[in-house]
C-alpha cells in the first residue's frame, strides 16, 4: 500500500503543479480545462474500478479473517470455561475497512468528477463574460450557461461532432474557439451563415443585399466607460436584440489579420463585405465599435463551435441580470 500512496501523491502533485502553472502563467503554459477534467475522470475512474474489484475485497477478506480468528479464540476460551473475552474486534474491523487517504482522494471523488465531466462535456457548460464586446446583451461579469448539444454533441478535448443537431442560425449567441488561438473561447453573435453575403458598411448591416431592420432605442449608459452610447434594436433571425454604436468611431476596419478565405472579403473606407464560405460563420459582437470579431480575424469554422449561449445564471454585482436573453 505504501507504493500506491507514493504513486497517488505524485499524480496529485502533477495535477496541482499543472493547475498552479496555468493559473500563474508560468512558462507560458496554456491550460486546457477540458483535457484536465478528462484526465481527472480517467484517473479517478481507474482507482474507483480498482477499489471495487481489488482493494475493497482484500480489506473485507482481512476483516473477515480477524473476525474468524476472534471467534475461534472465543470458542477455545469457552471450552476452557472462560466466558469473558478481552479485545474489541469491531474497532479493528472498522479500521481495516476504512479507505486509505489515497483512495479517498481518487476513487472517492470519481462519482462527482464523472458527473461534472458528463454535464460539462455533453449538456451545459458555464462561462464568464470577460469583456464588453457583447454589451448590452451580456455585461462583464455575467456568468452564463452554454447549451452543448443544440448544434450537435461533440467529443470532449478533440471537439469532434458525433451527432448533427441543429445548424447555427443568424442571431444566435454562440461560444466558439477563437480561430487564431483555439485554446481561447470567444462569444459573439452569428451574423452570417454559410453562403451568406454579409456587408457592414457605414455601420449598417445587410445580409444578401437586404438591410437588416433596426430601430432606435434610448441611449445606453455604460457604467464601466462612464458614458452614453447610441442604442438600437436589430431584427436578425427570429428574435430582436439590442446593439450599440459609437458615432465617434469610424466605419473603417483597422488592423485586419491575414486569415483563411480572406479573399472572400473586400475592405473599404466604409467597412467590409464578405462571402461566408461553406462550413463557416461570420460573427460580430453587439457592441459593434468595441468588438474584435470576424471583421478582423475572419470566419469561424464549424469545428470550432462550442455551443449556444442562452442563460445568465449569476452576476454577483447585479442579481437582476439572472435570466434568459436573445
Ranges and model annotations:
Residues 103-105, 131:
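Alpha-helical transmembrane segments in multi-pass membrane proteins
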Amino acid at each position: 500500500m505504501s507504493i500506491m500512496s507514493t504513486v497517488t501523491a505524485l499524480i496529485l502533485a502533477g495535477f496541482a503543479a499543472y493547475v498552479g502553472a496555468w493559473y500563474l502563467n508560468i512558462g507560458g503554459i496554456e491550460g486546457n480545462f477540458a483535457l484536465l477534467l478528462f484526465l481527472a475522470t480517467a484517473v479517478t475512474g481507474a482507482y474507483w474500478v480498482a477499489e471495487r474489484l481489488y482493494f475493497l475485497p482484500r480489506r473485507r477478506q482481512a476483516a473477515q479473517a480477524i473476525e474468524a480468528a476472534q471467534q475461534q479464540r472465543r470458542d477455545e476460551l469457552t471450552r476452557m470455561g472462560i466466558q469473558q473475552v478481552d479485545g474489541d474486534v469491531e474497532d479493528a474491523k472498522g479500521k481495516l475497512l476504512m479507505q486509505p487517504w489515497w483512495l479517498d482522494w481518487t476513487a472517492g471523488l470519481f462519482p462527482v468528477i464523472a458527473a461534472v465531466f458528463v454535464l460539462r462535456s455533453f449538456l451545459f457548460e458555464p462561462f464568464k463574460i470577460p469583456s464588453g464586446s457583447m454589451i448590452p446583451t451580456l455585461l462583464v461579469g455575467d456568468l452564463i450557461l452554454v447549451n452543448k448539444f443544440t448544434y450537435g454533441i461533440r467529443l470532449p478535448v478533440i471537439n469532434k461532432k458525433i451527432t448533427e443537431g441543429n445548424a447555427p442560425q443568424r442571431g444566435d449567441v454562440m461560444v466558439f474557439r477563437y480561430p487564431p488561438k483555439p485554446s481561447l473561447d470567444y462569444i459573439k453573435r452569428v451574423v452570417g451563415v454559410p453562403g451568406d453575403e454579409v456587408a457592414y458598411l457605414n455601420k449598417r448591416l445587410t445580409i444578401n443585399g437586404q438591410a437588416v431592420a433596426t430601430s432606435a432605442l434610448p441611449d445606453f449608459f455604460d457604467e464601466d466607460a462612464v458614458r452614453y452610447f447610441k442604442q438600437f434594436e436589430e431584427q436578425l433571425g427570429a428574435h430582436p436584440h439590442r446593439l450599440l454604436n459609437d458615432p465617434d468611431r469610424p466605419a473603417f476596419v483597422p488592423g485586419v489579420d491575414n486569415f483563411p478565405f480572406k479573399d472572400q472579403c473586400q475592405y473599404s473606407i466604409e467597412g467590409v463585405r464578405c462571402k461566408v464560405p461553406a462550413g463557416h460563420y461570420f460573427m460580430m459582437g453587439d457592441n459593434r465599435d468595441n468588438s474584435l470579431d470576424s471583421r478582423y480575424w475572419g470566419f469561424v469554422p464549424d469545428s470550432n463551435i462550442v455551443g449556444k449561449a442562452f442563460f445568465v445564471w449569476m452576476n454577483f454585482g447585479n442579481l437582476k441580470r439572472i435570466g434568459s436573453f436573445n
